[in-house]
Each structure stands twice: as C-alpha cells, then as structure tokens.
Amino acid sequence: MVTDQEIRTGAFHLVGEDVSREDLAVRRETKCLLPNADVGKFRKLLEGNARRLIHNEPVSTVRSIYFDDIRLNDCQANLDGISPRRKVRLRWYDSLTPGDVLFFEVKWRDNRVTGKHRLELRAQRSVSELTYRQLIDELIDVLPPHHMAELLKRGDPVVLVEYRREHFASADGRLRVTLDYDLAFYDQTGKRSISTSFPCRLPEMFVVETKGPEDCQREMKELLYPFAPRMGACSKYVHGCCQLGLVPPRNYH
C-alpha cells in the first residue's frame, strides 16, 4: 500500500512512499556475519520459531545500487563508526537489471536505531538503457525535495550489491529476521550505465539480520533460540567497497 501521490516523469512514475511498512520508520537493527555457516540449519530453526514471508518468490534476489560522493564519505563514516549516518540506494528484486518496479531508499542509522524512507517507482522505459547521468537526472526530476537533496549529495554510483534473501517474521509480525547469502559486488565507478560485468563473489558470506522495535530484544532472542549470535558491524555496501579495492584494506566485520 502506498500513498496516493501521483507524480509523473519521463522515465519514472513516482507512486509514493510505502506506508504499509510502519516498521521501516524507526527500528532496532542488528546484524551477524557468519562465514561459511550452514544456511539450511538457520532456515530450519526459523521455520520452527517463526513464519516464513514470501515476496514474489520464496527466496528473493535483491540488487541495490549504492550512491556516494567522490570521496566515499558514506562508506568512510561506516568504517569509522560515525553516527548518525545515511546511505542512498536504488533497489529492485528478482531480475538482473531493473524491471518495472524499483525503490529509492534513504537509510539512516543512529547507533543501533535505524530507519528507512522507501519510495516506490514505476519505470516508464527500460532503466538499463539509461546512462547513469540520465538515471540520476530522472530521479532528481521526480523525487520529493528532501529526498532529492540526499541524492544530490551523493551523485556517484559506486557499487551494485546482489544477494539472495529469505524472510521470516514473528507471529504478530513485529519482529523480522532475514537470511542473506550468495553475495556479489559489481563495481560501478566510472561506468557509463548499470554494469553487471565481472562480479566479485563472496559465496562464504552469510548474514543474519534482525529487525524490530527497541523494546523487543527478549522476544528477538526467543525467535533465534538456541542460537545466540554475536552481533556486529556488517554493511554490505562497505564490504563491497573493501572487496573491490575502492577503499584501503581494513579489518571490517
């Protein structure tokens, strides 16, 4: 469900901000990186403790283009642990290049509290045929001013992040857990248009993400029981920058 905002532009139709997911506005989000873990065991655990959510496919394929400035300040802020901080991305699902439905997202973090503005876009023409300059100009034309300003500060496409994701939720829907694996990163720096050539794959990388209200930590532990993960920093965008050599090597996990 989205707001009834109706704005049209050449390449995109802005449907509006997703208001069906109130949990996106403010929530506590934690991540755990588990190299070479058995995805099947975690899937079985969550199928017993939670309910599976299916969005189009039982296993979603998520692809996001992250935008940053020329100095990669958003990436550096994450590496340095600076808070609050933001990330800007264009996301789509279940196709190698963008299809008819995309989401422009501004994600913010203040310590462990996070939130996300998620705007649904409908493509009026093939997005993969646009140059990045055209893509950014088209987004600027249709985005609300406060979101447009976030993109203007980050005018460079940096990394396309790709992974497979499985979704689970508590019985009441307040808590969510995702299993992310089969990660791949595509360097977008200096590219004229969206590039899916020469992926840098990390098949051993497995990420468990938990998301829910700040006051539901006990319930979250019950959802993951008997697994008691040690949560830590794990930005897929930052991992992509590190793996592609866009930032100096650093022990980031």
Where are these regions (language model features)?
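Phosphate-end processing signature that detects enzymes handling 5′-triphosphorylated RNA
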Residues: 1-253
